[in-house]
Each structure stands twice: as C-alpha cells, then as structure tokens.
Amino acid sequence: METSAPAPALEKKEAKSGLLEDSSFPDPGKKACPLAVAAAVAAHGVPQQLLPAFHAPLPIDMRHQEGRYHYDPHSVHSVHGPPTLSGSPVISDISLIRLSPHPAGPGESPFSAHHPYVNPHMEHYLRSVHSSPTLSMISAARGLSPADVAHEHLKERGLFSLAAPGTNPSDYYHQMTLMASHPTPYGDLLMQSGGAASAPHLHDYLNPVDASRFSSPRVTPRLSRKRALSISPLSDASLDLQRMIRTSPNSLVAYINNSRSSSAASGSYGHLSAGALSPAFTFPHPINPVAYQQILSQQRGLGSAFGHTPPLIQPSPTFLAQQPMTLTSISTMPTQLSSSSSNCLNDANQNKQNSESAVSSTVNPITIHKRSKVKTEAEGLRPASPLGLTQEQLADLKEDLDRDDCKQEAEVVIYETNCHWADCTKEYDTQEQLVHHINNEHIHGEKKEFVCRWQACTREQKPFKAQYMLVVHMRRHTGEKPHKCTFEGCSKAYSRLENLKTHLRSHTGEKPYVCEHEGCNKAFSNASDRAKHQNRTHSNEKPYICKIPGCTKRYTDPSSLRKHVKTVHGPDAHVTKKQRNDVHVRAPLLKENGDNEASAEPGGRGPEESVEASSTSHTVEDCLHIKAIKTESSGLCQSSPGAQSSCSSEPSPLGSAPNNDSGMEMPGTGPGSLGDLTALADTCPGADTSALAAPSTGGLQLRKHMSTVHRFEQLKREKLKSLKDSCSWAGPAPHTRNTKLPPLPVNGSVLENFNNTGGGGPAGLLPSQRLPELTEVTMLSQLQERRDSSTSTMSSAYTVSRRSSGISPYFSSRRSSEASPLGGLRPHNASSADSYDPISTDASRRSSEASQCSGGGPGLLNLTPAQQYNLRAKYAAATGGPPPTPLPGLDRVSLRTRLALLDAPERALPGACPHPLGPRRGSDGPTYSHGHGHGYAGAAPAFPHEGPNSSTRRASDPVRRPDPLILPRVQRFHSTHNMNPGSLPPCADRRGLHVQSHPSVDSNLTRNAYSPRPPSINENVVMEAVAAGVDGPGLECDLGLVEDELVLPDDVVQYIKAHTGGTLDDGIRQGYPTEGTGFPENSKLPSPGLQGHRRLAAADSNMGPSAPGLGGCQLSYSPSSNLNKSNMPVQWNEVSSGTVDALPTQVKPPPFPHSNLAVVQQKPAFGQYPGYNPQSVQSSSGGLDSTQPHLQLRGAPSASRGSYTQQPRQPAAGSQCLGMSAAMSPQASYSQAHPQLSPNIVSGSLNQFSPSCSNMAAKPSHLGLPQQMEVVPNATIMNGHQREHGVPNSSLAAVSQPHPVLSYPQQDSYQQGSNLLSSHQPGFMESQQNAGFGLMQPRPPLEPNTASRHRGVRSGQQQLYARTTGQAMVTSANQETAEAMPKGPAGTMVSLAPQPSQDTGRAQDQNTLYYYGQIHMYEQNGGCPAVQPQPPQPQACSDSIQPEPLPSPGVNQVSSTVDSQLLEPPQIDFDAIMDDGDHSSLFSGALSPTLLHNLSQNSSRLTTPRNSLTLPSIPAGISNMAVGDMSSMLTSLAEESKFLNMMT
C-alpha cells in the first residue's frame, strides 16, 4: 500500500519547479539582488509574504569574508536520491511535504490542518509507516508531523529561514520544495545583505543581528560520499594541533574561527537537524501567545535551550487534537523549564541547563525539556540516557574512544579559580587567569613530562602522551570550555575541540555515519551515536557494566557508562579503561531505572556533548523508550517526555521489555510522575502514537517492547493515582507517594487473573464503593485524547487485512482472543483505546492485548456523547488541559435533555467485572453458550443491544428521529433467533430504553445498568431522548427526539440536495419521508448515512414482536445477540475482520420447505401493482442450492427490515411470515450489461405467509440500479395465496414485471419456492399457533449444529411487527439505504426508505428488501395503494405499534461469511463499513458480479459471502459494492474521513 499523499506534493512541486529556474536566480558564486529575487518570485505568483524567508544574511564569519568557504555548486538532491544516498534523511522524503493549502484554525498551527483527502490519523499512519524509515524515525523523534519533518529536513540544509508570520503553510512548503529542487545553492541567497531589515516584524531575539547566527550556507554535503569533504581549504594534515597548542598555550579559542567547523570525517549533517537554524530562521508556526511571551521573556536564559528551535514547535495536527494533556504541558513548557524545575535548578545553572539541552533545530520542546541536563556542583548531575554499540562496533569504538586518554574521564561542570596543582595554592579571580597560570607555569614548566599533578586527580599522575592532552585534561579541573559554538543563539561550549566539531554538525547537518544495519537508513553525526543506535535499535546487548560497588547498571556503550558514573556516582568515580572495556555480559536485570537514560549523552566523544551529539535515534528512543523517570538522587531533576519536569524517586510504571532500546534495563514496576505518564501513556499501543511521536519505527518499537499487560496496568495505575490526586471530583484518594493501586480494567490493560477470579480479578480487589470513582478516573484518562467508537473519526478501510480490526469496537484483530483470556462467551469492548485508530501503529493485531473486562463500572463506553463531553470537560478542568470539542448538536438539544445527559454516570455497578468477554470472531473459537439458563453465559451482563429497545448506530450515522414505536420487550437469549413468549432477563434492558406503550414486562430493570459495550450514537440518541423524557427506570417514554435534536452533517444535506433536485425534504431530514412522498421512480436518496441510526435503540434488533398479535410475522429472526455486529459501532475495518454473527441453529425445522418470494424485476414504476399475477414468477434457471444462502425478504407486518437474509441453512421455523425470502441464485445467467437483478437471479416463491403477514406485499423500492430490482407487491399474492396460516403457498411469488433488458426466457414460469430452495433451507420461521397473536421471542436453539446456523441473518434485522393485523408492514427501518451502496445518483442500492406511516391504520407496504448477508438491497415502498391489506385481525398492539425507528444502514451488513459448515458465523458489516461518505471509489460497480461471483466460502474481507448472489455489473458511475482491494479503499478515505470528522 502506497500513500497517495506524496503524489500531490510531487505534482505541485514539479508544477512549481520551474519557478526559480526561470526567475534569474544567480549562478553559483553570484549574488542575486533581493529586488530581483522578489520580482522573479512575484512574477510567478509566489506570495510576497514569502520573501522574508529569503533573508539576505550578514556575512557569517571571517571565513566567508576571506572567501575560504567553497560552496558546493551542485543542487540539493531531488526528491529521491540514488540508492547509495538512501541513508540521507534530508531530501529523500521531501515528496511527503504536504503542499495542499489548509486553512488553519485560530488556535492551531497552519500545519495542523487536515489534509483534505486524508484523515489525520491516516495521514500520520501513511506518512510514517510507508515513508522511509528515516523520515519516520525523525518524525517520531522530533515530535513533528511528517510535514514538519520535511520542513525540518530543508531547514537542516539551511535552505530557508523564517517565513513571514502570515505565510500560508502551503506556499511556504512550495517555497521549500522549490528551493530543495532547484540547482542553485541557496546559500547565495542567504549571503545577500539586508537580512536584518527583511524581518522587521520579528522580535530582536528573532532578528539576525549577529553574523554567527547563521548556519553554514552550504546547501548539502556530497551525498554520494559517506564522509563529506571538508568545507575548509585546510586539510587534516594542515591542522597541527600540537603547533596550535604550543603557539597558544592558554587556549585554542583563537583558532576556532579560523579552523574548520567540521573535520574531513564529519560527513553528512547532524542528527539533530541541520536545520538548526538560529532563531533568525525560526519555524513559522503560529506560536501560542502564552508560550511565546514566556520564551521572549527568557530570551537569553532559555535562548540556548531553544537556540535552534522555533520559539515553540506546535504539535502536529493529531497531536493537537488528541493530546490535550500533553498539549497543556507544551504550552506551559517554557515555564516548566525555568520554574517547575526550580527545585532542581538554580539561576546560576539555568543557562547551563539550557546549554545542555538538546541542541536540535527539530527537537520537539517536549524532547528538549526531557533532555534538559542539570549540572550543578552541589547536586548530582542528571542521568544520561545510555546509547549503545553493536558488538561489531565495539572494537572500532574502543579505538575511537581511546584515541586520547582524556576521553575516559568524566567531565565535571565547575568553575575553578584556585590552583590545586601539587604544591601550588595560588588563587585567581577568574577562570581564565587560572587557566593561563596552569598552562604557562605548570604544563609548560614541565616540558618533558605530561603529568597532571592536580590534587585528587583520578589519573594518579599517569602521564599523557602529548602536551595537548594534558592541556585538555586540565580543563576537567578548571572547568574551562574554550571551544564555543559560534552559531548565534547557541551557547554551547566544550573543553575539547572534537566535541565542538561534533556539535557543529548539528548546525551544519552533516551525518556521515549511516547505520550499518540492513534496511536502516538512519545517519548520525558521529560514530558513537551510530553505534548507540545500532546497539539499542538492532541489538540488545549491554556489555558495559558499572563497576561501582553495589551498582548493577548495564549499558550498551562506554559513553553511557561514563555518563552514568559521572552523574550518579560523582566525578571522582572514574571509569577506568578496564571498566570501559569489560564486555562480559551479565544476565539483564530488571531494576529501577536509576538514571534517565533517555536523556543520554549522545556524543560518544565527550561527556559534555552528551545531548548535542545526540542523533535522531535518540530523539525517537528517548521519547518512546523512557520507561522510568527516576534519578538516583532525590535532589535531581528529572524531566519527562510529557514536557513536565518532575522529580521522582520511583521508576515510571512503564517497565521495559528485555529488548528495550533505552540502553539499559528499565524498571518493571513502580509509579512515575504525572508528567511522565502524560506522554508515555499517550504513546502506548492503546493510545495515539501520533501524540508524542508520529507513528514510526520508533512507535512500532515502543509497542513491541511495551505491549505487556504489566506495563499498561502500571501506567494506568500511576496515571489513575495522579489523576485522583489532582481531580477532587474523582473522589478522595490516598496521597501517599507509594500508593499502589490494583490493576483496573482500563485502557490497554487486561485483568490477567480474570479467568481465575471469575470477574473478581484485580479490579475485584477494589472496594465496591471505590470502583465507580476509579472507573470514572479511568474513563477520564481514556477521554483525555480518545474518542469512543461512537465518535470515531477514523476509517480503517485501509486496514483491510485481518489486522484491520484495530478499529473494531470489539476486538482489534484476529488475535483478539489473546485479549480475552477472561474466557467470556460474548464479545464486548470495554476499551476505547483499541476501538479504532487504525492509523496509529497501535492498531495492529496486537492491539487487542488492550482488552478489558466486561464489567467493572460505568465505563466511558457506557456514556452518551454528552456525558463523555462532560467528563472530558471535567478532565480538562482538573488537569488544566484544553476544553473538549463541543458536541456537534449539543447546543440544539433541549435543555431538559442536556441536563439529563450531562449528569455524570451514577449507575450502580453490577460487579467489578461481571463477566469476561470472549473472542469477537467465530474463528477465535466458539463464544456462544447454549445452555446457561436462558442462554446467558454465566452472569455476563446483557449487552445494550440485548435490551429490547436499544440498538447501535455507527458514529458516522446521522442522528435521526425515531418513530415513536412502542414495542414490547422480548426476552433475549444468548443464542437469539427463536422467539418465545417470555420476560426479559433482569439485565436485558441494558440501556433502559423502555419504549413501551403497554406495561413493561421488566419494569424493574434499571435504566442505567452498566453495559460493557460502547453505546452507539444511535443508543446515545435514544438515551438522550429517554433522559429527556424518562424520570425513572422502567418508565415508558416516547423515543421521538425533538425535532431540533436532529443533526445532519452539512455535506450530507448538500449531498441529499444534490441528488434530490436541490431540495431536501423536511420529512427526509427528520428521517421520515411522509407516505405521500413515496419515492418516485428516479428519486434516490443515496446517503446511507442519512438513513437513520443503525437500528435506533427503540427498534432494537433484539426486540421480537412480543406484543400479542405481533408474533406471527416475524420473519426468520435469527440474529445472535452475542456477536451482533449490527449492534456494534462497526468501524471500517470490520470489513476485514471477517467476523460474522454466529447464528445458532433453529429450534426445529418447520414442516414446510422454505420457499422464497421470487425477487423479480419490475418496471421502475413504483407503486402500481394491483394486478400482478402470481404465476408470472421468474424461476431461477439453476434454482438455489440447498447450501446456498438465499435472499430472504423478511417482510413481516412490521417488517422493519424485509431483508434478503443470507441463511445458509435455516430450518423453517414455522409457516408464519416466512418472509418473502428471495433466493438469489448464483447460477443466474443474465446480461452483465443490464444493471438490474435478473429474475433468474432471485427467484422463489413466498411459500409460507402467516395471515398476519399476508398483507405484506413486497413492493419494490427503487434500488440504486437503473432498473430497480423490485419485489412484486401484489396484494393478491400476499393475501390470496397466504390466507391460511402455516400452509406453504408456493404460488406466492413476486412476479417479474417485463423489463426491456430482461434477457431471461423464464420470465413467466411459475416457480415453487421448493424448487429453488431445498428443504435443507427451510425458513427459520417458527410456526405460531396464533395467526396474529403469537409472541415471537428468541429461544436458545435446540440443535447446536453450526451447519444450520444462519449466516446472513442479523440481529440487526428488526423483528417484524404488524402495525395492525391487516396492515401492510410498516417499516420505517426501510428508510436506510444499503450502506454498501454508494450514494451516487444511480448508486443507491436503496431508493430511500419507505415513509413511516403517519396513520397506524393505513396499510403500509414498506418493506426493506435486503440481500441480507451479502448486499443489502433495501426495498422500500412508500405506500402502495394497490396492495390489498387483509382485514385486520385483532391485535393487542395494533394501534400502538409505531413504525420501527429507522435502523441505520449498518443494521444489515453484508458480511464476509466463513464456511457455513464450520465456523461460528460472524458477519462483516458492509453497511457499517460503507457507512458514510461517497464511497463510490470503494465499489467496483453496483453489485458487481466480480465481487459476488465465485466467492470463497471462507471469510474474504471485503468480498461478499459465498456465491449466493451474482448480479449484473452496473455502469461505472453506479458502483455499489465494495471491492476488497486496498487502493480503492484508500482512495475512499477522503470522503470517509471527512464525513466522520464532521460527525464527531
């Protein structure tokens, strides 16, 4: 899968590539006039505001004035360099620059705007995972979005500087790209004069006032060379250090400006970003006003810390949107650096801390903060992060490090003014005087002996080989650092010239050392960094062991060991060469992380360059692998990746796997600081890795190494503790530092002992009264940057593999069973973290490891959007984070409803974890209990969809008003397809949506019972309505939402207008097209998303017609409540999950064969079928094999979904309302050219219609096809032939109206349903003794034969209710279009829903014609005047039955069925998958035969189930069916993401 993002960037770049070429830019060596440049740029349409970016810099230093710098005239290598240059992370990924303009919100970075066609999650995922490793690592390391990384890459090359404040990011990137691709070295541009005046708007801190402020103008090194050529005319040989030292014994400073800024071995540019442009070239992000003021107020104090970074690099789009807590930290970070750490810092060391901060122009402030180094004389130094060597590099590194002996010495930051040379007690006022004294009197006094005689020197007077070594060594004692960085804004100084050279690479961008590991393209500014990276990333060896007695630290490289010894054990605890070279490896020890290895000293050369030389590997690994934040001295200040400094004596809860890359063993237990947890938790697999670091190799490594449950539980425990400490509303909590909270069923955790404790696992340890508090805190932690599936904004279409179910609300992958060692028998998702986010690297097959127990409290997933919003607001208020995004329609909700919804959950908890959940997929193992009493697995709480009146709806489904359908409750069993009269289990009413007009059979149920499954928006809508109208549990209410609560996304409205003649019917907007609006022949309301909730809660699929007289018409209700996909907020990747609703076998085969109403084509004329002759049935040419799923038009009196249900083997469960089951015969041979369903394809006879169903004339609604497939609504067929209950009437068949394109001779042949369907496929209807009064309620199947399980039947298919005895079916459910059908003009498979009957007495033939398990062909007929309703039979609820609420298109999903013989039949929800947006690109053609033809009997991702239906191809514009290819799905993400974002 290749991202589509680079293409637009490339095209735009190429389109603009001629800009500079044609603009008379100077040749190398010439200097272009600023006016000429401006004119040239303006001539090409480049906004003038970009011109300030072309600073005319002042001369950099004397080298430029003397002309000793020779600039490489060749161009910056274009987008992708030669293979040998693949290691260069600089230009190779410029193609990923996001060039399209994005309007930036008032408070967000211009780069934070989402790509118009790519969801931000998707963008991060695609850009990072599918870009080169280098880009990914850099992106993750620096906390930048891919676009920011590209920006930084260019910045590293010194290709640009600050853009004017109002610069459009798109134009800015255009400029950068052009500059990168143009052959002229833009260093010349930087040489122009007047640079300071070009940015008058900038603060003086940002203005180029000093020549040294500018980075080297050299555009790029010779990328083809491993080591770049020296940029100085001097060669190595010409630089005589001995001569320099002897000539100027006091210092080498005089030679710095005249010497090379990098050696010949310097190579490519520095790991920290060559962009390290000084503040003059700041990042053009809009800066948070507060943070900006803080930075300006600390110009010089913190200037060094941000010397090469913009005042504040705003986080990437998802970082802003998803990381409220971290964002808060960032916005206050400068203050934290200076004040929060005040307990560890003093003013004297402020600059030192800053100078030791990561000197990276691309380092995210979080990382910078994390790496801030505190060096004080009185306090221990901050621990350094270990960086490692590969075993192969040990020898080379050893040689490198031993080049001079002084390297092995730990360096102390001191300022000595008194001489402690042996027998010398002189005192001086300044350090310079002391240095002069030592060099002249002591060192040069002993011409032949180079021995340090400083008192207490650890070398013990071991002589040096050369005098310069002694001179350098003495700097350890005096604290002299003569080698200062000459770049403006950088206050780095080093005692060793080599360290300075290494540091300068961070400014110049040289990275000559490329990782030698195959497939890794990372480059580093020094060999030590590369060795550390290789050992940390590609190896796990830690050969360097601290020899200090009692210390068991192990490190991957000597520099980390030195750092550790120096900072932890003190400067005098010298690391001897023996210690350094000891490579005997001891067994890794999991212990406390004594020193924060993340802020490692990257520069292998010398301790003082610890952070400067740090490379991109450090940024990644430091950000992602800091498992513990603990210093071995309580006085030490430890900053965290969350940009919050904290001093902690305990390690972070994030333990580390043995293979962690931190360079040392990380602690496995112990809480850390809130700041640490803030970022770490957000980068955990369950969370958005786009938060702290863009998804990248680093993120993958993080997940790989931190995926154990233990770490997650520790993390959440600590975060929970911190939140409880900081949030008063969370309830009092012990404030002791070492409080150990038991594991909670929180995001990313699995109660390991759940199987053994039977629901009383670790969570059970908590007092029951405390559990709600803890749960609420947990919910808050989840809410801080998570949205539940009900508000998911991400599509997982591109995760069409089996690991795609990362978005799945139930479990994230086929490995989901790993997440449920709990042994539950029903799927359920209590974790919002793994509900979606496919784009993050976390949405993998492993993400299911973050499963949770099914109970434990009113979890986040139990809340309505309003309640979640309320919690988010509380959380933000408690943590100081930004307020949550207001709900889309909350302001329109009535006050009463709003007040009711905003109440925090106060439900009684059924238990800590009442029952575990089981694998989501049938392939993960049987998860159905057939014998636990009523079919419930133990004490497992009923799911929301098990409540009779609740139902799920995808988050993307627009909120629609439900009809005030008052339906009786039905008893749901674990295996629900058979309906028996009975009462609901106490927990059946999960959501408490008692929508009844008659006494409730379970009025004692609590309305707010805990549900382990995330409430869909549909449920939330109903809950909101209930909250507005119900005063107590068990009360009956009308589900009709007030009109102003209906919220339709703008694009949906526009779409509807576009396809309905520009007018949006009010009835449609309300979800209720009036009967009179009956959709005309060509009227197509294509927006599946519009069609209403996925089974609005009131019309829960689980509610069988339990009202007296309703039962007779239930058509093959065989959905399993257990794996009820339609009840799940199915995400895109449900498609690939291959799950199917396992429908247990029917109680008994009915005596009658299951005849199907032949679905035949009729003229598009919509409602006039009074005279259809039942004998004109089209017979299927091949008949339907008994093993073949058949379309079952479930038209019951209230056929909420007369649906073509794929029922592989459904014993006829009775003769009542067999449901017009249209068998789709795959053998049907029909002309592909005709986009209509051939009568041959679907043929059969509605054989068994109960009297209550006799009125059900299956009227065709206009499918999205040019010729709509229609079921003949012949009243005579319905009534005349089905007069007798339970008598198979083969004559009942939908007749085929002549169609111009029918190419099948057998148009008039009468076909018995028995011919089409063998007796092996008896209808699942159970015969009822009462024609109209039998209550159908699900009963556990009597025979567990999987072969007879229903495949396509979904619980989503509402029970069919007769509004009145003789009335045609009233199915407002019909108002949903098949979501699998695109919303194109001819693309709606369903011509929109039948209008709910406003008059309960009116006959309403609104039958949704579903091809259930495969493609939902919704047949909806407004009113069919020709239908002759049978005289109404007395029914208890004839008048109270309202049309069922509009089910969302997701109700009946086309599911990828697995072998009907073997697997538990889960289903893939095509409806939900195709739920929103114009997915025309997602479908290869309406009901493309290629999709449905020759399908495997095994689960086939997006392909529909087995060969049950072959349909003619549709013209290109009418693509309706999903094609299982990744590319088409990716292209559809634009609409999907756009719509989802609008919905959320």
From Swiss-Prot:
Q: Which GO molecular function entries does the Swiss-Prot or TrEMBL record give?
A: chromatin binding; chromatin DNA binding; DNA-binding transcription activator activity, RNA polymerase II-specific; DNA-binding transcription factor activity; promoter-specific chromatin binding; RNA polymerase II cis-regulatory region sequence-specific DNA binding; sequence-specific DNA binding; transcription cis-regulatory region binding
Query: For this UniProt entry, what's an example GO CC term?
Result: GLI-SUFU complex
| Start-end of C2H2-type zinc fingers | 417-444, 455-477, 483-507, 513-538, 544-569
User: InterPro entries under this entry?
Assistant: GLI-like, Znf-C2H2_ZIC1-5/GLI1-3-like, Znf_C2H2_sf, Znf_C2H2_type
Q: Which residues carry this modification: Phosphoserine?
A: S145, S230, S232, S238, S385, S707, S997
Q: Which residues carry this modification: N6-acetyllysine?
A: K740
Superkingdom, natural source = Eukaryota
List all Low complexity biased stretches. Answer: 637-657
| Presence of the UniProt keyword Phosphoprotein in the record | yes
Where is this chain primarily localised? nucleus
- This protein's domain notes: The N-terminal domain confers transcriptional repressor activity, while the C-terminal domain mediates transcriptional activation.
Q: What is the protein named?
A: Zinc finger protein GLI2
Q: Which gene encodes it?
A: Gli2
